[in-house]
Amino acid sequence: PKNHTIESYTNELISKQLPKVVESKLARSADVFCEPGWFGIDESEEILLAARKHGLALRMHIDEFCDGGGGELAAKLNVDTADHAHYTSMETREKMKQSGVNTGFLPGTPYSMGADWPDFNSMNEKEIPWTIATDFNPNNQILSLPFIASILVQRCNVDPLAALAACTINASFTTPHETNERHGVIAKGAVANLNILQSHQWESWCLSPGHSSVGSTVLNGKLLKHEL
């Protein structure tokens, strides 16, 4: 913001904004965009440690434009997930895995920017946990998660089942929940949040860019029909 240095704004965020957010119960997690030119390593660590003291879960956005060391900090602090991670080295990804940190990919960003794709299949071979999301923002106005999954399947040679796991069961482990019920799976005793497809093939949800095969959604056990 204007009239602030990165140091003064970090101090204001920690001393004024963060306590207000926690007091108002507006958040369960704190997320820092750790990137050269934005919040650096030191500022990111300071903010995240303050958030942890307030009882918030920790998340990060890292290495969208270069390998800026955010992955190392994510591993050090055992954050729940480090998103973007576009230029994070495989060595650092493995450190993140050892620290229980999920790698959250946002494929819409390289799609919109014309950048290269991360090596998803090497991640699978090394059993590094990863998720996907849309990263909807003014520079990447993609709201459709099925479209994001179709990018992985059709442009990055990712198996449809891996894409499905990335935005269901894997994603559920990165999100704080109010109860201990299972999320992200279709199983007895799990929360009944699921989509019903108008298709004979389950893979259709991520193989038809520009068209949604979802006909109905079950949200907390209640059936909601879509207008197609």
Q: Where are the regions a protein language model picked out?
A:
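Active-site-adjacent C-terminal substructures of enzyme catalytic domains
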Residues: 57, 67-182, 197-199, 209, ...
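Conserved beta-strand segments that form the floor/walls of ligand-binding pockets within enzyme
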Residues: 29-31, 131, 218
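C-terminal cap of metal-dependent C-N hydrolases
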Residues: 169, 188-228
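Metal-coordinating catalytic core of metallo-dependent amide/deamination hydrolases
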Residues: 1-68
